[in-house]
Amino acid sequence: VLEMGLRGAKVLAPEAIDYARRHGITLHARASFTEGRGTVITHRPHPGVGRAVAVTGDRTALPITVRGPRSDIDTFFEWLGSAGIRWKDARRAESDGAASAELVIDTLNTPDGGERVADWWSGSKGSCTVYTSLKTATIVGEGIAEQAAVWQLASERLTSLGVVSPSMVGSAWGLTAQIPEDRLDDVVRAWHAHLPGLG
């Protein structure tokens, strides 16, 4: 299942699947996108920490920035959970009582998520910016964000393409950049072609 996700299929809980893989838990899955016996999942050796295993582009990702009193930001994150809007890559900051958060919401199952977030903030003391023209590209690999060479390569490829990314963040399983939607495929191809072991 994780391999399917690394190759672009939408996986709703990649962290849980990665946990199962690392702890020897057997998962069984069947594909619903084609006729036949379903997807055969085979055992592969762990690719190693710090090695890129895939590059993905996500057109269902929607970057958002919110600003306001800390209490509003806290309430906002609680509301996201109760509204069923999935989010990731949240970065919070606070200064002199004012707070802000940058995050990415998943619009696959909540296509109106951006509008719902903007509506929620319209009645508060804060502000909300929904970046509808941005999507995300991710270099996938356990511990990949700890590799300075990967950050450098990702930045160099963006520069060579003339693409400006307003945000690049690392997580336990990838390095994600916000990319203008019309350049997403170019970035995914360039990263894939230049990463050792993928190109």
Task: List each language-model region with its residue ranges.
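C-terminal catalytic "cap/lid" subdomain
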Residues: 1-170, 174-199
